[in-house]
Amino acid sequence: MEKDKGKYISLFYGLSFFGTVIGAIIPTVENWGVTTAGSANDATYIALFILMVMGSVVACCISDPSRVIRNDGSRVFIPRNTTFVQELKNIVLAIKREPWIILFFPYSFAGLWYIPYQSNDFNGYFFDLRTRAFGSLWFDFGQFAMAVVMGMLLDLKAIGGRRRRAFVCWGVLFTLLNAVFIGGVFPARISHRGVTPPGGLIDLTDSSRAGGYIALFVFYGCVDGAWQTFAWWIAGALSNDPLVLSIYSSFYKVFGAMGAAIVFSLDVRGVSYQGMFGSYWGLLAGSMLFVFVLIYKRVHDTSVLLTGAVALEKADEEPSNAAKGV
C-alpha cells in the first residue's frame, strides 16, 4: 500500500544492512589483535562464506507471491513472463510514458560511488586492521539505523501528504549529506596516496584521534543508508505498477553499477584522495538537485490514478490490476 512503502523499503534495507552488521562482527573478532595494516586472515573469509551460504538457504523459504495478501485483502499483482525483446521495448515505452525519470539517472549513477573512497581511501588509509574492522561494524550499523529512520520519516503522516514528505525528507538527506562531507574535508586534505597518515595508522585505543575519525566513518554509513531508502521510495512514488517499478529499479541498479565501475577504475588509476573525495561529494550533492526537480514535477500525494502497465502490455489487452492502482 502507498502509505506503507517507506516502512517496507526500510524493512528490506534494514534487514540487508543488519546482515552486514552481523558480517562485520566476524572480521572484528578474528582480527582484534592485529594492529598493523595487514589483510584479513583466511578464517574471516571462511566464516563470511558460511554466512552467505546460510543466507542462500533461508532465501529458499520465501513465500510464493501467489500466497501474499495485503492488509486490505487484495492480492499482489504477478506480472506475466515476457521475452527479452519485449523487455527492451518496455524500457523505451517506460521512458516515453515518464520522461521525467531521466532526472533519476544521475542519482542512480551516484548511488554506489561511495564504495572505493570510504572503504579504500578513508577506512583503509587511516586505520590499522582491527580498527578498520571495528569501524566497519559501526559503519554498517549507521547504514542500518538511518535506513530505518528514513523509512519512518517518509511514511510519517504528521509531516503531511506524500508530496510534502518527499520535500521534507529530501531536505533532511541533503542537509545530512553536506554536513557530513564538510566534516570529511579535514581528513581528506591530509591524506595522500603512498604516504602514511600523519601520526601513523590510527588504532582504536588512540583516544585523541580514533573517536572523531570513526564517528565520521559512521556518519558516512548513515548517509548511504538514508540514500538507498530514499532512492527506492522516490521510484515507488512515481507508480504503483510493478511492471513499471521493475524497470525503474533496473535503471537504479544499472546506472549504479556503471558509476561503481567508473569510480573503481579511477581509484585503481591512482586519482588523488582529494579528487576522489571531491567527485564523491559533487556527484551526490549535484544529483540531489535533479531529484528535487523530479519531486516537484512528478511526485503527488497518490499514484493510484497513474497508469503504466497499459503502455507496457499489448494495446489490445485489458489493463493490469496494478495499472488500476491495486
Question: Residue spans of the language-model regions?
Answer:
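A helix-boundary/kink motif common to multi-pass secondary transporters
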Residues: T35, A40, A158-R165, N240, ...
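Short, flexible helix-coil linker/hinge segments at the edges of structured domains or between repeats
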Residues: N31-V92
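Membrane-interfacial loop- and helix-cap regions that link adjacent transmembrane helices
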Residues: M54, I62, R75-S249
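Glycine-rich segments within core transmembrane alpha-helices of 12-TM secondary carriers
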Residues: E2-A40, T44-G55, Y107, G111, ...
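C-terminal transmembrane module of eukaryotic multi-pass membrane proteins
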Residues: A215-V254, M258-S265, V271-G282, S287-V293
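Intrinsically disordered, low-complexity terminal tails of fungal membrane proteins
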Residues: V68-F84, H300-V326
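Helix-loop junctions on the cytosolic side of multi-pass membrane transporters
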Residues: C60-R75, P187-S191, V293-L305
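Symmetry-related core transmembrane helices of the 12-TM Major Facilitator Superfamily/SLC fold
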Residues: L11-F17, N41-I62, Y107-S108, G171-V180, ...
